[in-house]
From Swiss-Prot:
The lineage of its organism: Bacteria, Bacillati, Cyanobacteriota, Cyanophyceae, Synechococcales. InterPro entries: DNA-dir_RNA_pol_bsu_ext_1_sf (IPR042107), DNA-dir_RNA_pol_bsu_external_1 (IPR019462), DNA-dir_RNA_pol_su2 (IPR015712), DNA-dir_RNAP_su2_dom (IPR007120), DNA-dir_RNAP_su2_hyb_sf (IPR037033), RNA_pol_bsu_bac (IPR010243), RNA_pol_bsu_CS (IPR007121), RNA_pol_bsu_protrusion (IPR007644). It comes from the Bacteria. This is DNA-directed RNA polymerase subunit beta. Residues 1064-1100 are annotated as: Disordered. GO terms for molecular function: DNA binding; DNA-directed RNA polymerase activity; ribonucleoside binding. It catalyses: RNA(n) + a ribonucleoside 5'-triphosphate = RNA(n+1) + diphosphate. One of its GO terms (cellular component) is DNA-directed RNA polymerase complex. Belongs to the RNA polymerase beta chain family. In cyanobacteria the RNAP catalytic core is composed of 2 alpha, 1 beta, 1 beta', 1 gamma and 1 omega subunit. When a sigma factor is associated with the core the holoenzyme is formed, which can initiate transcription. Residues 1079-1089 have a biased composition (Polar residues). CDD domains: RNA_pol_B_RPB2 (cd00653). The gene is rpoB.
Length: 1100
């Protein structure tokens, strides 16, 4: 294809998109870990004789046992061992022992920002939480009076809440306990009346509290404090003192954190040093003073908005890990203290004191089961990138879905350029999980910053470096959006400019603008920024599109879009799927699996490419070189493509010829009609790799064996297995085929009667093993691409009880078929309803058949008109042999820029091709199309173009499912649900109503009895079907018996009676449970209930 036409200056280069993960983990290694180790040092025993010091600054990490690929292959964890020099000091003898001790394994981050835990790639999602600090809020009481309160929230420790009441008294609550008078707390801190009055701007308001309560001395105040916090215990002064000390002034128990101290100083105008992380009496006085000023409404004070991003901060990997290390060290400290006390002080060494288990367990728990440690979404490079940039308000220390109201989920003006207003899940998590905007970064305090250009006298200073600002700093400035029009010198054009000022959207003159946003793309996330003509789409559809692009399956031959936004190369590069050259140099060697670059200085750099590996989502990860031997390579240039990338650009779908028209009702309700070409030419074919695993365990009756000798299996089924009973690589397998042969020893009890009979007659011991082989599940087929064998002898770590583990990888090519889900980039999704032969598809005047027919009714009501612009510009691109990069929000280049550009390009295409039908001025974008079946033209011209369509991961092959016989639920005896359990389809209450309405009584009876939970009836019915006899009358469903038992357990005398007839007068009770104890319940219907007599009957 020819070089791309630039319709807009390329968006300002984005920062490194995975930096948030990498920087955070680097901070943890350089500062966070040391900080934690030093805060626990020294640990003294209960008598104070022994001291153990951790020299945190000198900790060491040993090289990882396996590298990244090896860890994945062995199902291991990619981690390093942490060693810390420790010093044990015996105070009595003055003896000092120094030793380096092992304190645990620390999983290492890969260069792509992920962790490998037990062989699977995981991502730690960033958490967005309320920042520690002081928050003021106003509430109306039931009489409509405005009262104010303040909450002092630490990083960890007790909350302190100050409130005023209708009488103008000031109260304090400690950790949501009962109210205390504010003067009790202040006096207990040891402050005199004069000191208190000096610090308050309006002491007369506080005086009311003293008048009402009376004076307290310091001792009385401490006693009162103790009484309120520990009711029922005899109060003492020393107890009160100790309680107060430990609650607020002990750094172990109470910590504001760096951020909390910074926020407190900022809000209350204090100058307390950054290192003081506990509360001071000055803080408490200032907080009360601010509250009184709010209450008197004297200006200069305002209540806080908790949803403002200045009051919410991001906790990334480093900090989350640091908190977890603190938990582990806390447990470790307890153990060390106990060991110091119990053991003999002479024989003690640091190594015998420090047990790595608690720390290892805490870290393992965090990576293995924390809500924020997630299995990485590897469907395609974009999914991977977005996952690392995700912001979640859920998780430990965050919100819960049920408690989160509308305010928390809503878009806030301070989100501008920090959190994407569009990308969030649909459903219960909407608004709680967001995505970082493209240019946003997180500062040292954890607040999100976004860049702006400075404006001086109406001139945008793009020559200066952009200024990064937090939401707080930006509040009092007038900030214009990124798409304001400027002249060549940078002066803002126009007289009224839209700006954001103090959380409001207003207008102002160019001279009063303080800053301008860096780029129009700044406010949205990476996934959203890949939607061309985004400004013409409704936000709900843009949200669906952002989420669906992450579900696009990498195709066999990726193709980059004709119409893009210019951010595709960077998205691909930062996802880590493509390989870039580290230096300027020459490509000295290339083959399918390896690339070597020789730098100009002579150094050599080698890269091994990933070939056909399985991703977490069963898609295929594969890299292919795009350079040749002898080529020059520049630093940062892409030298190998990954899955779903082409020439270093993200390529999630295919450009195909699309028309918007109804066709015989096949595209009713968003259904999609496609041409057979997409199947034959493998346009939408993808490779999926499934993993099947089996382990040979040690059982009570002996070990299980992986073998070729499987009982009752013909030679035909074993032809693909090697001598050990394991399938060979390259074999084609279909459902039911054996992948790994395995036999399990079985005891006497689980032998069917015919085997017992044989042994009784011939006295021979039939081989007492059971076939327990790994077979291909229902509906799966493919080619075996890899087999891996793990045994203890090779030094592999196996699960307890397993002697051998075999893993088989089966790859399948999935062509597109009816039932698959497809989508465009504008939230236009649908299911394929029919695949037409090419000759029946509508065709263009030059005879080209269409690839796909979409319903035009999908556009107007959904208001995603961007798809129409895209398809027409794509059509022009194909005819002109050009690709377009269209940055969203293009009105800064003039009104209706999108429409004018598209029409101009289409008329240019008409001139170049010399085909007048390509573009008509009367009906722009519409073309006369002919019916492929009759050759007649359709009644009206149709919108035709090239759209970029994706195939999504919801494939019909993974969903289609049927059941004949299968497992039943234990209690209700009804079939289980779901494909994985080989379940049935639930015939629910409403479906029953439908059959009742039709009067289909017998079908309904069968559904509720023999097809479901009439245990005896279903076995009899199965036997009857096998023998071709009439199905007997159904019995009582098990669930009815369960219901009766439940009612009887509530002491209700409930039973079933046979109504009276002429033979006997009174009703007769029927015992439904009569046959329950006699029968042995088979988990599946069996044929054992056939008697010899039945078999004879058949021959009659």
């Amino acid at each position: 294809m020819a070089e791309q036409t630039q319709l807009a200056p390329a968006a300002f280069h984005l920062p490194d998109l995975v930096a948030i993960q990498r920087n955070s983990f680097r901070w943890f290694l350089e500062e966070g870990l040391i900080e934690e180790l030093e805060s626990f040092s020294p640990i003294t025993d209960y008598t104070g004789k022994l001291e153990l010091h951790f020299l945190g600054k000198q900790y060491k990490l040993k090289r990882p046992k396996y590298d990244v690929d090896e860890a994945k292959r062995r199902d291991g964890t990619y981690s390093v061992q942490m060693y810390v020099p420790t010093r044990l000091i015996n105070k009595e003898t003055g003896e000092i022992k120094e030793q380096e001790v092992f304190i645990g394994d620390l999983p290492l981050m890969t260069d792509r920002g992920t962790f490998i835990i037990n062989g699977a790639e995981r991502v730690i999602v960033n958490q967005i939480v309320r920042s520690p600090g002081v928050y003021y809020k106003s509430e109306r009481d039931k009489n409509g009076r405005l009262t104010h309160n303040a909450s002092l929230i630490p990083n960890r420790g007790a909350w302190l809440k100050f409130e005023t009441d209708k009488n103008g008294l000031v109260w304090v609550r400690i950790d949501k306990t009962r109210k205390l008078s504010a003067q009790v707390l202040l006096k207990a801190l040891g402050l005199s009346d004069n000191e208190i009055y000096d610090k308050l701007r309006h002491p007369e308001y506080y005086q009311k509290t003293i008048d009402k309560e009376g004076q307290f001395s310091e001792d009385e105040a401490l006693m009162e404090l103790y009484r309120k916090l520990r009711p029922g215990e005899p109060p003492t002064v020393s107890g009160g003192q100790q309680l107060l000390e430990s609650r607020f002034f002990d750094p172990k128990r109470y910590d504001l954190g760096r951020v909390g101290r910074y926020k407190l100083n900022k809000k209350l105008g204090l100058n307390v040093a950054d290192t003081v992380r506990t509360l001071t009496s000055e803080d408490i006085l200032a907080a009360i003073d601010y509250l009184i000023n709010l209450e008197l409404d004297l200006g200069g004070c305002e209540v806080d908005d908790i949803d403002h991003l200045g009051n919410r901060r991001v906790r990334s990997v480093g900090e989350l890990l640091q908190n977890q290390v603190r938990v582990g060290l806390n447990r470790l400290e307890r153990i060390i203290r106990e060991r110091m006390t119990v053991s003999d002080s002479d024989s003690l060494s640091p190594a015998s004191l420090v047990n790595p288990k608690p720390l290892v367990a805490a870290i393992k728990e965090f990576f293995g089961s924390s809500q924020l440690s997630q299995f990485m979404d590897q469907t395609n490079p974009l999914a991977e990138l977005t996952h690392k940039r995700r912001l979640s308000a859920l998780g430990p220390g965050g919100l819960t879905r049920e408690r989160a109201g509308f305010a928390v989920r809503d878009i806030h003006p301070s989100h501008y350029g920090r959190i994407c207003p569009i990308e969030t899940p649909e459903g219960p998590n909407a608004g709680l999980i967001g995505s970082l905007a493209t240019h946003a970064r997180v500062n040292d305090y954890g607040f999100i910053e976004t860049p702006f250009w400075r404006v001086e006298e109406g001139r945008v200073r793009k020559d200066l470096a952009p200024v990064y600002m937090t939401a707080d700093q930006e509040d009092d400035l007038r900030v214009a959006p990124g798409d304001v029009a400027t002249d060549d010198a940078g002066y803002i054009l126009g007289t009224t400019i839209p700006v954001r000022y103090r959380q409001d959207f207003t207008t102002t003159t160019p001279e009063r603008v303080d800053y301008v946003a860096l780029s129009p793309v700044q406010i949205i996330s990476v996934a959203t920024s890949l939607i061309p003509f985004l400004e013409h789409d409704d936000a709900n559809r843009a949200l669906m599109s952002s989420n669906m692009q992450r579900q696009a399956v990498p195709l066999l031959r990726p193709e980059r879009p004709l119409v893009g936004t210019g951010l595709e190369p960077q998205a691909a590069r930062d996802s880590g799927m493509v390989i870039t050259s580290p230096v300027d140099g020459t490509i000295s060697y290339v083959d399918a699996t390896h690339i070597e670059v020789t730098a100009d200085t002579g150094e050599k750099y080698g890269y091994a490419l990933q070939k056909y590996q399985r991703s977490n989502q069963d898609t295929c990860l594969n890299q292919r070189p795009i350079v040749f031997e002898g080529d020059r390579g520049q630093r940062g240039q892409v030298i190998a493509d990954g899955s779903a990338t082409e020439k270093g650009e993200l390529a999630l779908g295919q450009n195909i010829l699309v028309a918007y028209m109804p066709w015989e009702g096949y595209n009713y309700e968003d259904a999609i009609l496609i041409s057979e070409r997409l199947v034959y030419d493998d346009v939408y074919t993808s490779i999926h790799i499934e993993k099947f695993e089996i382990e040979a365990r040690q059982t009570k009756l002996g070990p299980e064996e992986i073998t070729r000798e499987i009982p009752n299996v013909g030679e035909d089924a074993l032809r693909q297995l090697d001598e050990n009973g394991i399938i060979r690589v390259g074999a084609w397998v279909e459902s039911g085929d054996i992948l790994v042969g395995k036999v399990t020893p079985k005891g006497e009890s689980d032998q069917p009667p015919e085997e017992k009979l044989l042994r009784a007659i011939f006295g021979e011991k039939a081989r007492d093993v059971r076939d327990n082989s790994l077979r291909v599940p229902n509906g799966e087929k493919g080619r075996v691409v890899d087999v891996r064998l793990f045994t203890r002898e090779q030094g592999d770590e196996l699960p307890p009880g397993a002697n051998m583990v075999v893993r088989v990888y089966v790859a399948q090519k999935r062509k597109i078929q009816v039932g698959d889900k497809m989508a465009g980039r504008h939230g236009n999704k649908g299911i394929i309803s029919r695949i037409l032969p090419c000759e029946d598809m509508p065709y263009l005047p030059d005879g080209t058949p269409l690839d796909i027919v979409l319903n035009p009714l999908g556009v107007p009501s959904r208001m995603n008109v961007g798809q129409v612009f895209e398809c027409m510009l794509g059509w022009a691109g194909q005819l002109l042999d050009a690709r377009f990069k269209v940055t969203p929000f293009d009105e800064m280049y003039g009104a209706e820029a999108s429409r004018l550009t598209v029409n101009a390009k289409l008329s240019e295409a008409r001139e170049q091709t010399g085909q007048p039908w390509v573009f008509s001025d009367d009906e722009p974008g519409k073309i006369q199309v002919y019916d492929g079946r009759t050759g007649e033209p359709f009644d009206r011209p149709v919108t035709v173009g090239r759209a970029y369509m994706l195939k999504l991961v919801h494939l019909v092959d993974d969903k289609i499912h049927a059941r004949s016989t299968g497992p039943y639920s234990l209690v209700t005896q009804q079939p289980l649900g779901g494909k994985a359990q080989q379940g049935g389809q639930r015939f629910g209450e409403m479906e029953v109503w439908a059959l009742e309405a039709y009067g289909a009584a017998y079908i309904l009876q069968e559904l509720l009895t023999v097809k479901s939970d009439d245990m005896q009836g279903r076995n009899e019915a199965l036997n009857a079907i096998v023998k071709g006899k009439a199905i007997p009358r159904p019995g009582t469903p098990e669930s009815f018996k369960v219901l009766m038992r439940e009612l009887q357990s509530l002491c209700l005398d409930i039973a079933v009676y046979k109504a009276s007839t002429e033979d006997y007068e009174e009703d007769k009770e029927v015992d439904l449970m009569a046959d329950v104890n006699q029968r042995r319940t088979p988990s599946r219907p069996t044929y054992e209930s056939m008697s010899v007599g039945d078999i004879d009957d058949d021959d009659d």
